[in-house]
Amino acid sequence: MKKTAIAIAVALAGFATVAQAAPKDNTWYAGAKLGWSQYHDTGFIHNDGPTHENQLGAGAFGGYQVNPYVGFEMGYDWLGRMPYKGDNINGAYKAQGVQLTAKLGYPITDDLDVYTRLGGMVWRADTKSNVPGGPSTKDHDTGVSPVFAGGIEYAITPEIATRLEYQWTNNIGDANTIGTRPDNGLLSVGVSYRFGQQEAAPVVAPAPAPAPEVQTKHFTLKSDVLFNFNKSTLKPEGQQALDQLYSQLSNLDPKDGSVVVLGFTDRIGSDAYNQGLSEKRAQSVVDYLISKGIPSDKISARGMGESNPVTGNTCDNVKPRAALIDCLAPDRRVEIEVKGVKDVVTQPQA
């Protein structure tokens, strides 16, 4: 029977495949076990009756998992009370101990490990005997014995695991002191709780801020409304038109906004003259809007001369000067560009 028990332990420790069901690295666990305890090689001195070697065994244990393959375990075992009865003597033997072992495991699947435990047990063995019709005697002994165990462990959840284990303890007692020196095999089922197995909640990166949206607003004012022909001084009607424009610009209130005033002329006159006139008209508009409240560092003037005419070739065949001036009126204009970053409102995440 002893050889069979050792063979079972070795076989259980010898299985191997590829996944991991051990607790997470550097975590603790605790559990309890219950099972069948069997004493072997009892050899009671002077016993002439039956010995009840099969008893109930139990224990509690705690451990520390270093990595998926190595852990250390400490536990208490109650190996059971073994009575014996005879014609000449009656009595009982009981043993218990504290063990410390290294636990070596190997994964079979994601949820199943095989393992072996190797270490020692500090035990205490007690006996009580009496001769029918005579006095009873008690004695005890303590010592250290090697412990070998093998088993399989199944993770029901990341925190809870169950195990099936066979444990062998050699030579528990001193025959000269308590009358026997048995070995013990304990086949048990255990349940353990593993601490610290919960995965940390993933950190959700905040949604990136939306890219700023740049918006541009265009306004076009007729130069004939703002200025007299061939002049750069604002007319009263022109000031009224700019007052209305300023109100619209104030309502826009663009973030980090800027205003560019572009002056245009018609093609009548030289290029140089028209360029200068367009710059003066644009600057007149800028100066007026600054006087109304637009910051001077947010507004600029640019003369465009006779470039970008909107009339195209519509007036090519118009010869009388007065008629040509009227025909080219759309080219004489002031354009205003307002650029700014539009605020993007994002909804809070639930």
From Swiss-Prot:
Q: What is the lineage of its organism?
A: Bacteria, Pseudomonadati, Pseudomonadota, Gammaproteobacteria, Enterobacterales
- Gene Ontology molecular-function annotations: porin activity
Briefly, what is this protein's role? With TolR probably plays a role in maintaining the position of the peptidoglycan cell wall in the periplasm. Acts as a porin with low permeability that allows slow penetration of small solutes; an internal gate slows down solute passage.
NCBIfam families named in the record: PRK10808.1 (NF008071)
| sequence repeat feature ranges | 205-206, 207-208, 209-210, 211-212
Q: Which gene encodes it?
A: ompA
Compartment(s) of residence: Cell outer membrane
Family per record = Belongs to the outer membrane OOP (TC 1.B.6) superfamily. OmpA family.
- Where does the signal peptide begin and end? 1-21
Description of how the protein assembles with itself and partners: Monomer and homodimer.
UniProt region (4 X 2 AA tandem repeats of A-P), positions on chain:
205-212
Query: By what name is this protein known?
Result: Outer membrane protein A
Q: Which PROSITE patterns match?
A: OMPA_1, OMPA_2
Query: Could you mention a single GO BP entry for this protein?
Result: monoatomic ion transmembrane transport
List site positions: Part of salt bridge gating mechanism: 73, 163
Tell me which GO cellular component terms the UniProt record holds.
cell outer membrane; pore complex
Q: Which CDD domains match?
A: OmpA_C-like
* Origin: domain of life: Bacteria
Residue ranges of every copy of the OmpA-like domain listed in the record = 214-342
Q: Which organism is it from?
A: Salmonella typhimurium (strain LT2 / SGSC1412 / ATCC 700720)
